Amino acid sequence: MRKKKFLSKVSFGSLFLLCGTVLSACTGIQADLRNLIKEATGKDIDVYKAIKTTEGKKNMITSLKKSYKVNPKDTTKLLLDAWKQSAEKGELGIPDFDFDDVIYPASKDPFTMERKIEYFQMTYQSFKDLSIEAKLSYTFNWFGDYSSGDFTAKKGDKHYFDLFPKIKSNSDPGKQFTTEKFLTKEEKIKVNGKEITRNLEWIEFSASLSFSLKGKDDVSEKSVNKFLSTFANNTEGYSSDINLFIYLEYLIK
């Protein structure tokens, strides 16, 4: 299945304002990260350069592990601020909300998908009581005709639906956030019969995810039921590991 591209449209004025806001946020994250690493290790590093190499990323995660030991409050704030700022830019880093596992039409996929984050509200005192509520709005833009059973879509049609995710800390005592969640390791996997080594740089947060999904009108609800039925209601919640390091990468790179 080909991955859907998420599209967004902004005016030139909005883009200019956004760029200024993003630059300020990224600069703040870089400065905070640099200060925490210096506090924990005594080293003053260029995080912009370090985060572009495997060795640099490993050293950064190791340094943040030390930082979490000596200053858990500010290290927690840094990691969660990076997550929130990334989400505000449209980067969630949670594959489930990209619907990669959904089975789309087998031949050609006659639509694109747009996603907009309406709000992303985060509250916490520590990782133990982290709680996030958000609203994501999606649009199917049909650029071709499609028909299957009682569902039809015409070129130019638009279908709209909203996703309401809730993200909380995993209550399992064995999955609580600790210094053991700062991971740098090599993993051997097979690709096309050949063994390759993959580097993993993770700061792992074990979360409990739940969400509801609703079409904005009857036709859109049919689209949801057709393509997203397995996602329509998951209010009981399930475990998912989220890599917090990717948000630092996203903002700094």
From Swiss-Prot:
Q: Which domain of life does the UniProt lineage start with? A: Bacteria
Q: Which UniProt keywords apply?
A: Cell membrane, Lipoprotein, Membrane, Palmitate, Signal
Residues with a covalently attached lipid (N-palmitoyl cysteine): C26
Q: Where is the signal peptide?
A: 1-25
Q: What single Pfam family name could you report for this chain, choosing any that match?
A: Lipoprotein_3
Tell me which GO cellular component terms the UniProt record holds: plasma membrane
Please give the InterPro entries that the UniProt record associates with this protein.
Lipoprotein_3
Tell me if Magnesium is a UniProt keyword of this record. Answer: no
**S-diacylglycerol cysteine lipidation: where?**
C26
Q: How does the protein associate with the membrane?
A: Lipid-anchor
Cellular compartments annotated: Cell membrane
Does Protease count among this protein's keywords? no
Sequence similarity: Belongs to the MG439/MG440 family.
- Protein name per Swiss-Prot or TrEMBL: Uncharacterized lipoprotein MPN_369
- The organism named in the record is Mycoplasma pneumoniae (strain ATCC 29342 / M129 / Subtype 1)
